[in-house]
């Protein structure tokens, strides 16, 4: 049975993305803005398009995305992770290709907490000999 919409949730750092894939001509809309307007820099656009390019469905599916939290890098990673999960619902045979490129793995690195007595997570106060 062919569905008209495929859903995937992606997370990275403190960003969370909800991705809906539909049949279309390759448009990517993020929070009601085009990909070029939401991410003007090319490096983030490449990260987002990578799952679609690896599976050769860039011009077949449209992506409608809502993303909240985090910064631009975390949001781009969350969107990429969400697109990957939605592509698996679209076609489970993509799993080996996506796994080989490292797109299926959730990047679990988070910001380290600030410790008491330190200026940052690991940065100690300036040392004065005298």
Curated annotation (Swiss-Prot):
InterPro entries to which the protein is assigned, alphabetical: Ribosomal_Su5_D2-typ_SF, Ribosomal_uS9, Ribosomal_uS9_bac/plastid, Ribosomal_uS9_CS, Ribsml_uS5_D2-typ_fold_subgr
Q: Supply the alphabetized keyword list.
A: Ribonucleoprotein, Ribosomal protein
Where does the secretion signal sit in this chain?
none
GO terms (molecular function) for this protein are: RNA binding; structural constituent of ribosome
Q: What biological processes does GO assign it?
A: translation
Any one GO CC term of the record = cytosolic small ribosomal subunit
Q: Which residues form a coiled coil?
A: none
Family that this chain belongs to: Belongs to the universal ribosomal protein uS9 family.
> Which HAMAP family does this entry report, sorted A to Z?
Ribosomal_uS9_B
Q: Which PANTHER family match?
A: RIBOSOMAL PROTEIN S9, SMALL RIBOSOMAL SUBUNIT PROTEIN US9M
NCBIfam families reported in the protein's UniProt record: PRK00132.1
Any idea what this protein is called?
Answer: Small ribosomal subunit protein uS9
Organism listed in the record: Blochmanniella floridana
């Amino acid at each position: 049975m062919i569905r008209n919409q495929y859903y995937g949730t992606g997370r990275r750092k403190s960003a969370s993305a909800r991705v809906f894939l539909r049949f279309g001509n390759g448009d990517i809309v993020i929070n009601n803005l085009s990909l070029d307007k939401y991410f003007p820099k090319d490096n983030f656009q490449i990260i987002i398009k990578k799952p679609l390019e690896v599976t050769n469905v860039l011009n077949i599916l449209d992506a409608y995305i809502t993303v909240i939290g985090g910064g631009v890098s975390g949001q781009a990673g969350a969107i990429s992770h969400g697109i990957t999960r939605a592509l698996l619902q679209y076609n489970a045979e993509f799993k080996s290709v996506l796994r080989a490129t490292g797109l299926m793995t959730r990047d679990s690195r988070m910001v380290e907490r600030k410790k008491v007595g330190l200026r940052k997570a690991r940065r100690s106060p300036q040392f004065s000999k005298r």
